Amino acid sequence: RRKVEEDATSPGRVFRDAPFAPEMVEIPAGDFLMGSPGDEKRRYRVEGPQHRVAIPAPFALGKYAVTFDEFDHFFREAGPGYCPSGNKWGRGNRPVINVSWNDAVVYCRWLSKETGHDYRLPTEAEWEYACRAGTTTPFHFGKTISSQQANYGGDFSYGRDGHISECREKTVEVGQFPANALGLYDMHGNVWEWCADCFEKDAYNKHADVYPNMVGDMESS
């Protein structure tokens, strides 16, 4: 996630701050209903109650998940201590895996230093707002999911109209599936992504803003 100047006038603009930096997409300010309704299939209790959240300023989010190519360049230049494994699935344009929350934060700080722009992890609210891209369904592409839409555990069906699909059991290169309405790829599937927030089971009962809770236990989201 990168801060966008307040005078930005073209939400959706795609840019890259440096040849080694991720390609970014501007996301406009707005508001949305965060969380999932109580009757949504396969939801977790911590996804509710739904509540309206305002995103007060535009920001930018990576067009794709950070790739091994991008993270390996960071490793060569900054040496964070260890080189994350690719689980023998390949590196290159696949999303980087086996990185901790702290690794991700250090990478963002390095990007900030090298590019002169502010990078950080998105809050959970910013991430969900960007993922939904104006939709209210379980997925930004509708009520169900298939392996033609995302790389996920396709050996189970989702929703009334869902079907058993392909389960690839490994990551694939980024950008292999259709983007959402904001031009972001792989917002569902392929890898889990880190957010700035700490995990808190009853967070939705306590908080209703965009700012991260930095008190609870660290957990991927």
Feature map (PLM): residue ranges:
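N-terminal pre-domain segments of enzymes
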Residues: 1-17
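Alpha-helical interaction segments
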Residues: 4-6, 60-64, 97, 142
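Compositionally biased, intrinsically disordered low-complexity segments
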Residues: 7, 56-58, 213, 218
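Short glycine-aromatic motifs
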Residues: 2-4, 24, 119
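A short glycine-rich, aromatic-capped structural motif
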Residues: 14-82, 99-102, 188-189, 196
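Generic detector of low-complexity/intrinsically disordered segments
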Residues: 2-3, 57, 123
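Functional-site microenvironments in short loops/helix caps that host divalent-cation chemistry
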Residues: 33, 37-43, 81, 85-221
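Cysteine-rich, disulfide-stabilized extracellular repeat modules
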Residues: 11, 23, 28, 49, ...
